[in-house]
Amino acid sequence: MENGATSQSEGKDPSGFLSEIIGNPVTVKLNSGVVYKGELQSVDGYMNIALEKTEEFINGVKRRSYGDAFVRGNNVMYISAD
């Protein structure tokens, strides 16, 4: 970043970040554009994700709610802490 500014996530190990946010609300966006919001329960080295209290959003509209949701890692575009 310019002028010596650093971003909050710069230099942070992604696996460390993910282990820190387990149990917290996250947003998971898939390559298809579908978004899941829920409580992160686990994530593995392949980015396979388990969520609880999950809501599914398609084009910004809530479509479904799930107790548990499992997302295969190769479908994940990003995970962000809420």
UniProtKB/Swiss-Prot annotation:
Job of this protein: Component of LSm protein complexes, which are involved in RNA processing and may function in a chaperone-like manner, facilitating the efficient association of RNA processing factors with their substrates. Component of the cytoplasmic LSM1-LSM7 complex, which is thought to be involved in mRNA degradation by activating the decapping step in the 5'-to-3' mRNA decay pathway. Component of the nuclear LSM2-LSM8 complex, which is involved in splicing of nuclear mRNAs.
Keywords from the named record: Cytoplasm, mRNA processing, mRNA splicing, Nucleus, Ribonucleoprotein, RNA-binding, rRNA processing, Spliceosome, tRNA processing
GO molecular function: RNA binding
GO cellular component: Lsm1-7-Pat1 complex; nucleolus; P-body; sno(s)RNA-containing ribonucleoprotein complex; spliceosomal complex; U4/U6 x U5 tri-snRNP complex; U6 snRNP
Source lineage: Eukaryota, Fungi, Dikarya, Ascomycota, Pezizomycotina
Organism for this UniProt entry: Neurospora crassa (strain ATCC 24698 / 74-OR23-1A / CBS 708.71 / DSM 1257 / FGSC 987)
Domain Sm: 13-82
Name the record gives this protein: U6 snRNA-associated Sm-like protein LSm6
SUPFAM superfamilies given in the database record: Sm-like ribonucleoproteins
